[in-house]
Amino acid sequence: MGCARWLALGGLLALAGLLQARLLLPQQAGFGECDRFFYKGTPPAGLATEAHVRICQRFAGSERFATLYSPGHRIPVFSAFRAARPASRSAEQRGLLEPQIDDPDSNLEEVIDEANALTSVDNLGSKQALNADYIDSDYEIGQLYPFPLNSDLQMATFPLTNSVPMTQSFRERWHMNLNSLMDRALIPHCSEGKDLYILTGAVPSEHRVKGKVTIPEFVWLAACCAVPGEGWAMGFIKHTQDIDVIEDVMLRDLEKLLPHKPQLFQDNCGEMEQDTEKMKKILEVVNQVQDEERSLQSQERMSPLASTQSQRSALLSPEAPPEGGSSFLGQVLGFLATPFIKLFQLIYYLVTAVLRNIVHLLWLVAKQAINTVESCLYHLGEATVSYLVAIGQELVSIPWKVLKVVAKVIRAFLRILCCLLKAVCRALSIPLRVLVDVATFPVYTVGAIPIVCKDIAVGLGGTLSLLFDTAFGTVGGLFQIVFSVFKRIGYKVTLDNSGEF
C-alpha cells in the first residue's frame, strides 16, 4: 500500500507539473496569451477591479481558458472559454490550487495539490478557497464551467479558481444544463463550436461558507457565435436558491443583471449582423431543455411522496397474524375480499396520482401563464416607461425650444433696429449744404434749360457764320491767286474797267 500511495502521489505531481497558471501583473494588459478566448481579443469591460486577479490557465504547454478571480470572495468573477465541451458528469473531480494567489512571493509557477501546498505556500487559504472549507458543510465544490484540463475520462482535473460553492442537487442540475445546452443548442448552431466564445460567471451574495467562501446568488453563462453573417449572442442564468429551471435572457438583459452593468462582448458580439433565425432555432432547443428539467424536477418531487404513501399503506393495513381459532369460513371470506381490497387500494392510488398530476399540471400551466403575464407586463411597463420618458423629454424641451424661437425673434428685431439706427446716423452725418444742394438741384436744372438752349443756338449761329467766313475767305483767296497769275502774264485787270481788257 505504501508503494502504491507513493506512485499515486508521484503521478499527481507529474500531472500538476504539466498544469500551469500564469498570474498577470497589474501593469500587464488583458490576459496575455489567453486573450484569444475573448471575442476580438477583448475581455469584458466593467467587471475587473484592482482587487481582482487575472489568471491564464494553461495545461501541457498550451492555454486552456482565462479566469478573473476575486480574492475577497474567494470565487471567480468569470471564466472565458472557446470551443469547449463540458466534462462528463460521471467523472471524478480533483481540484488544484494556485499558490501565488495566497503567496505572491512564491516561486511556484504551477498549480499544485492542496496537500503539497500546506508545506510550501505561506498564508495558504487567505485569499482562495480550499477543499477543507467545504468539509462538514451543506455545499460542495462546483465548477462554473466543468471544462477539464486533462483528457482522462475517469479523473477530471480542475483548478479551484474556477469553482464556487454549490449544493449537490444544484451542481448536478447546472452541469446537466450546460451539457444539454452545449451539445444540443449552442455548438451545433455555431460551426461546431469553432467560432463560439463562452463566458461563465457568478454574482456573489451576502452569505458565505464558514464565513470564508462566498455563496453565489446566481450563476450565468453568455455565448457569442462569431460566424460572419450567421452569428448570434445569448445569455443564461440560474439562481442557486431557487428551484426554477435555467432561464434564457438576451445579452443586454444579462448585462443589466450583473454588477456595474458591464459589456461582455465587444460591440455586443456583432449585434448588427446577427442571424435572428438561428436564435429562434436555438431557443426552440432551449425550451426543450427547460421542459426536460421541469419534468425531472416533477419526478424528483413525486418519488418521495410515493415512497411515503407506500410506507403509510403498509402501516395502515398490516398483514394480520393467523389465529389458531379462526374458522374456515373467515379464511374464505378473507381470501375473497383481499382482491377487492387490493383493487380498491389500487384505484385509490391511481386516483390520487392522477389528481396530483392534474394539480401539478395546473400549477405548471398557472406558473407558465403567470410568467407569461409577468413578462408581458414587464415589457409593457418597459415600453410605457420608455414612452413616458420620451414624452417627458419632449415636454421638457418645449420651453427650451420656445426660448430659442423668442431669442431668434428678438435677435432679428435688434438687427432691424440696428440697421434703422445706422441709416438714421448716416443721414444725420450728411452736411446741411449738401442737403440744400440736393433739394435745389431740380430748380437749378429747370432754370438752366433756356440758357443751355440759348448757348446751343449761339453756338450753332457761330458755327454757320464760321462756315460762311471760311467759304468767302476761300473764294477770295482763289481770286487773289488768279489775279496774281494774270498779273505776271501781262494782263492787267482793274476793277474799275467796265469789262474790257
Swiss-Prot record:
Family note: Belongs to the DNA/RNA non-specific endonuclease family.
Subunit structure: Interacts with RNF26; this interaction is important to modulate innate immune signaling through the cGAS-STING pathway.
Major subcellular site: secreted
Record-annotated disulphide pairs: none
Chain positions found as N6-acetyllysine: K408
Organism name: Mus musculus (Mouse)
EC number: 3.1.30.-
GO molecular function: endonuclease activity; metal ion binding; nucleic acid binding
Taxonomy of the source species: Eukaryota, Metazoa, Chordata, Craniata, Vertebrata
Record keywords: Acetylation, Endonuclease, Hydrolase, Immunity, Innate immunity, Nuclease, Secreted, Signal
Protein's cellular compartments: Secreted
GO cellular component, one term: extracellular region
Coiled coil location: none
Protein name: Endonuclease domain-containing 1 protein
